[in-house]
Amino acid sequence: MSISTKVVFNRKTMEQVTESRRKPIVVGIGELLWDMLPSGKKAGGAPINFVYHASCLGAEGYAISAVGDDELGKEIVDELDKNHIQHLIEKVPYPTGTVQVELREGIPTYTIHERVAWDHISPTSDAIDLAEKADAICFGTLAQRSRQSRETIQAISSFAPKDAYRLLDINLRQRYYDKELIEESLYLANVLKMNDEEFNVLRDLFGLNGTEREVALWFIEKYGLRMFVLTAGSSHSTIYTREEISTLPTPEVMVADTVGAGDAFSGALIISLLKGKS
């Protein structure tokens, strides 16, 4: 398979992946960036964090995004390689993404810089080939703030097999979302995940009343979802399907910060589902 010189791609050939299939193929597409924390910078971006955790739990994980042709871009690709994250990363003439993160009592707030590389992800033939073989694909709303990445993410996600898990991990940041974007994404997804703050935003945005369960079932029926997943921080997490509800309390831990906690949850959830757990 020929690979564009614009693409940094460290993975097996599609033929090798198809032949082995010893591990589920999990794809994350969206923002790849540096979180600029008080303690220093850390590689991040929700879909890429998801891929990392899914890979640690046994998946054949792949990240799809874009970086700038700059030092930060080189460093973040090196970071992916160091952590054995396979990737399809395009180099584009925009700076590598950064996010300023401030922590108050371990809770992060974000200042997300605009006109960066991950606003310009392209639907390469390699990315489409990969999506067609995916057992699960994860995408969010943040990386869809630009028209180009929005069209790319929706196009690539649409190539995932019908029986694959298509996880929409809502990430409502700053002003980078609206009802139209969320609805477009919901029609592509079959699993919807959000935290309790995002739940309240969506309930207001869609003009819904009723209990948490009633709202969850409304989304499931309206958009044909397999499940609705809600995380509530230190309290609990709940998974709703048409037939069942499963709630677990959050284990007590010493919190350093919660950056990426939701992505770790998503990775563990998808791997558990792919292993046949209920």
Task: Describe each model-derived feature in a short phrase.
Residues 136, 140-214, 236:
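Conserved beta-alpha-beta core of the PfkB/ribokinase-like small-molecule kinase fold
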Residues 3-25, 210-278:
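Conserved phosphate-binding/catalytic region of the ribokinase-like
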Residues 60-141, 159-162:
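Conserved N-terminal subdomain of the carbohydrate kinase-like
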Residues 129-130, 184-185, 221:
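Structural alpha-helical scaffold elements that stabilize or flank donor/cofactor-binding regions
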Residues 8-12, 115-122, 172-177:
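Short gly/ser/thr-rich secondary-structure transition/capping motifs
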Residues 2-85, 99, 255-256:
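Glycine-rich phosphate/adenosyl-contacting loop at the front of the ribokinase-like
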